[in-house]
Amino acid sequence: MPKGGQDIKKIVVTVIGADRVGIVAGVTKELAKENINILDISQTILDGIFDMVLICDMENAKGSLKQVQDDMGELGRELGVDVRVQLADIFYAMHRI
């Protein structure tokens, strides 16, 4: 688990919605366009529900975190899924067991 501050450039992207063609392609294409590197990716489909979590490095990103959040949110609307982007430290703190 990340220690405070050391992973400030790491983000977690979550994607949830009905499974359909093009979700992975759309999300990864947008991240590449933003110059965001994917460090880890996990994807499952359960009973027609698509779920994907990506750990990414945005150290060399073209835009700010807010811009990436807005762009990915718009992409999610286009794809018919919920896409959320948050700092890794916040994600880990919210999902601590």
Show where each model-derived region lies:
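A conserved regulatory-domain signal marking ACT and ACT-like small-molecule sensing domains
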Residues: 2-97
